[in-house]
Design a protein with these regions (language model features):
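A ligand-binding cleft/hinge motif common to bilobed small-molecule-binding domains
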Residues: 101, 118-126, 171-176, 196-230
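Periplasmic-binding protein-like
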Residues: 55, 135-143, 210-253, 271
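Acidic, polar ligand-binding/catalytic clefts
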Residues: 79, 91-153, 221-222
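Bilobed "Venus flytrap"/periplasmic-binding protein-like clamshell domains
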Residues: 53, 70-85, 119, 137-190, ...
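Ligand-binding clefts/hinges and TM-proximal coupling segments of bilobed small-molecule sensing domains
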Residues: 24-45, 167-185, 218-227, 253-271
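C-terminal motif of bacterial Sec signal peptides marking the signal peptidase cleavage site
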Residues: 16-21
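Extended ligand-binding regions for polar small-molecule ligands
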Residues: 75-76, 84, 159, 166, ...
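Extracytoplasmic small-molecule ligand-binding "clamshell" domains
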Residues: 31-37, 42-113
Length: 271
């Protein structure tokens, strides 16, 4: 081959390689169709779903003092979500939370989600992703039978115990203003503390969502018939964990359609 021909061939090959290389560098790499989102992958790699749950709310999330086992409606929902992600409903790690601690534990990544009688509000939706509601309840009042109190107006001049950072305080205050009842609120860290305060006379009423109150009802107390401000419970996840939020919502939606959600509500005597 002549020298000029050889040089021409080399030039053509070089141009072809350069063109191919440039073309490849401008194309975006396509993610595999079965790629797993980072937030879901983190759970899969860990092998366990971490959930913040209530441990002092009978029927929703309650830790048996004898066995140490946490059971309830929301625990069963957590298991269903774990099964969706990991294929095994037992792969859960539940951590007890209160109305005051559930947000910070989610913020710092100690839990993947919070499913703990967490009421959906517009303000909270600015900070967290919330699923569609899986349970709706109204705020109620638990009082001592011997008190003779039969309605909210009868609490005029009385003290009402509520949980820290809970929505029940605002709901009751708004209704109290409507009926002209001047009430004082005392805030507590846990529901058992509020019940103890009611039993000892430190407060005249215990206010929280009605389904929760039923777990603290005994022979000496009664739940007033009035209900205030419907509370919608949702599963909360960090704003950045959008894939997990979607998976949670899809799981709950499927459970509603199949009737499984209603079965669990009936199982725990919430309907």
């Amino acid at each position: 081959m002549k020298k000029t021909g050889l040089l021409a061939l080399i030039a053509v090959l070089a141009f072809t390689l350069i063109t191919a290389g440039c073309g490849g560098s401008t194309q975006k790499a396509e993610a595999p169709k079965d790629a797993v989102a980072a937030d879901i992958k983190a759970i899969k790699d860990r092998g366990v779903l971490k959930a913040g749950v209530k441990v002092d709310v009978p029927k929703f999330g309650y830790k048996d003092p004898q066995s140490g086992k946490v059971e309830g409606f929301e625990i069963d929902l957590t298991k269903a979500i774990a099964k969706k992600i990991l294929g095994d409903e037992t792969k859960i790690d539940v951590q007890g939370v209160t109305a005051k601690t559930r947000g910070p534990l989610l913020d710092n990544g100690e839990v993947d989600m919070v499913i703990a009688t967490f009421t959906i509000t517009e303000e909270r939706k600015q900070t967290y992703n919330f699923s569609d509601p899986y349970f709706i309840d109204g705020v109620g009042l638990l009082v001592k039978k011997a008190s003779g109190i039969t309605n909210l107006k009868g609490l005029d001049g009385k003290k009402i115990g509520v949980a820290q950072s809970a929505t029940s305080k605002k709901a009751v205050q708004e209704e109290a203003d409507k009926v002209g009842a001047k009430v004082t609120f005392l805030e507590f860290g846990t529901y058992p503390e509020i019940k103890a305060a009611l039993d000892s006379g430190r407060v005249d009423a215990f206010s929280v969502d009605t389904a929760i109150l039923f777990g603290y009802l005994d022979d000496s107390t009664t739940i007033l018939s009035e209900r205030f401000s419907p509370q919608q419970y949702g599963v909360a996840t960090k704003k950045s964990n959008t894939a997990l939020a979607k998976l949670v919502n899809d799981t709950l939606s499927d459970m509603k359609k199949s009737g499984e959600l209603d079965k669990l509500i009936q199982k725990w005597g919430l309907k």
